[in-house]
Amino acid sequence: MTQEGKIEAILFAAGQAVKIRTLAEALEVTEEEVRELLKRLKEEYVKNHRGIDIVIFEDKVEMCTNDSYGDIVRKALKMEITQGLSQAALEVLAIIAYNQPITKAEIERIRGVRSDKPINTLLEYNLIKESGRASSPGRPILYSTTEDFLKYFGISSLKELPEIEPTS
């Protein structure tokens, strides 16, 4: 067993970001040694055109797909796309579906929280698109759902969306 292999196994099994300190403790090495191992892994992935990559942000590291393989991954897993969407992304998607075209500011007003990440995720999955600019000051981007949105949810028109129950 190699140290690099151990890191890969831990990151794959975790399925989310892992603290570098946690890796260091598991491998019984220093955090600097872990960072060096991660650097070597990244170099190996690039050199061998691997479909996976590791992303290091501050004190955490996460295994992910290589960006250049994104299209094939999305194509192969399109039926499972909603399983990968966070609750926040699903909320934003519902808001856009029922209120399109809509600006990010309007989405955030409805949700009460920032929505940059969910919007970017939905754009990446091609479930929403930039559909123009509002005429309000600053001309913010308007978002709408895409044809892929309809396909993924098995509907042929937005008219098929269930009616929203009024809140009291």
UniProtKB/Swiss-Prot annotation:
GO terms for cellular component: cytoplasm. InterPro entries: ScpB_csome_segregation, WH-like_DNA-bd_sf, WH_DNA-bd_sf. Keywords: Cell cycle, Cell division, Chromosome partition, Cytoplasm. It is found in: Cytoplasm. Pfam families: SMC_ScpB. PANTHER family: SEGREGATION AND CONDENSATION PROTEIN B. Homodimer. Homodimerization may be required to stabilize the binding of ScpA to the Smc head domains. Component of a cohesin-like complex composed of ScpA, ScpB and the Smc homodimer, in which ScpA and ScpB bind to the head domain of Smc. The presence of the three proteins is required for the association of the complex with DNA. This is Segregation and condensation protein B. It comes from Caldanaerobacter subterraneus subsp. tengcongensis (strain DSM 15242 / JCM 11007 / NBRC 100824 / MB4). The gene is scpB.
